[in-house]
Amino acid sequence: MRQVDGVKLLGRLGDGVNELRGRLTPDAPMDRVTWFRAGGLAEVMFQPHDTDDLIAFLKILPEDVPLTVVGVGSNLLVRDGGIPGVVVRLSAKGFGSVELADENRIKAGAICPDKHIAAMAMDNGIGGFHFYYGIPGSIGGALRMNAGANGGETRERVVEVYAVDRQGNQHVLSNADMGYSYRHSGADAGLIFTGALFEGYPEDKAKIRADMDAVRHHRETVQPIREQTGGSTFKNPEGHSAWELIDEAGGRGLVIGGAQMSSLHCNFMINTGHATGYDLEYLGETIRRRVFEKSGIRLEWEIKRLGLFMPGREVEPFLGA
């Protein structure tokens, strides 16, 4: 049963779409976007050509139409009923740049892969970015969730962030404006990040390369990077590692439908080949329940879940005792 109707919604956008340079696609399959390779349709997907094109689109988008923004889909679970309204997917051509802005400063577009900013920093002897080499995804997602790993976090490097609001107005946010905390940004959820300016510090290139090699070796050794996965499934509770709690609760290797908690790293959920969004989310909530029953600790999702459930295939969130 279809939960969204992109052709009908596209008709509501009017003649203004003829002036857009980006691509509008009704009923766009989200399983081609997310790294899980699962989920339903985006009612309409818009891939803007650049920031000006994005602004032009937002100015003709009716206020009552839901708007969702996605990047490369690395940390995203889409439900099987699809995503109502418009999904904006930023393009590499318009938002994927990375360049040296000034001494020890790098400017990157929101869709720039995290590892590209790490490589740019290494090539120019700028320290403080090696941790990005081990984070899947793009800068936009890193800005939104304060992505971090291997001793570094996004909030340590951000100078300012460039964004567009729902009405098409542009904003420049300072580091303080972003309201960062662990795996979270307090910035307005309605803002679309288009890029950011980062700052590091002078460091020997050989030292940076060694740090990046260590990050790469760690990922290849302990993470299922060649599987269909969205990265870390749950945030680390204060004072604990999520994977240890999952392991102690018997979650390592647990399978539901086509979804599995990796046997290599049990805080990574994988699609074994035929998982639905329902399988993945149900597995995640099962893990949350098991961990709470074992340890009394409530795991919080790190993976973002979006969209509608199919009728009769809803997943109830585990709320604890």
Curated annotation (Swiss-Prot):
Pathway: Cell wall biogenesis; peptidoglycan biosynthesis. Its EC number is 1.3.1.98. Keywords: Cell cycle, Cell division, Cell shape, Cell wall biogenesis/degradation, Cytoplasm, FAD, Flavoprotein, NADP, Oxidoreductase, Peptidoglycan synthesis. GO terms for biological process: cell division; cell wall organization; peptidoglycan biosynthetic process; regulation of cell shape. It is an enzyme of class 1 (oxidoreductase). Disulfide bonds: none annotated. It comes from Agrobacterium fabrum (strain C58 / ATCC 33970) (Agrobacterium tumefaciens (strain C58)). GO terms for molecular function: FAD binding; UDP-N-acetylmuramate dehydrogenase activity. It comes from the Bacteria. Pfam families: FAD_binding_4, MurB_C. The keyword Flavoprotein applies. The keyword Transcription regulation does not apply. Residues 36-203 form the FAD-binding PCMH-type domain. This is UDP-N-acetylenolpyruvoylglucosamine reductase. Cell wall formation. NCBIfam families: murB, PRK13905.1. Belongs to the MurB family. It catalyses: UDP-N-acetyl-alpha-D-muramate + NADP(+) = UDP-N-acetyl-3-O-(1-carboxyvinyl)-alpha-D-glucosamine + NADPH + H(+). Gene3D superfamilies: 3.30.465.10, UDP-N-acetylenolpyruvoylglucosamine reductase, C-terminal domain (3.90.78.10), Uridine Diphospho-n-acetylenolpyruvylglucosamine Reductase, domain 2 (3.30.43.10). GO terms for cellular component: cytosol. The active site is at 183, 232 (proton donor), 302. Its cofactor is FAD. It is found in: Cytoplasm. PROSITE patterns: FAD_PCMH (PS51387).
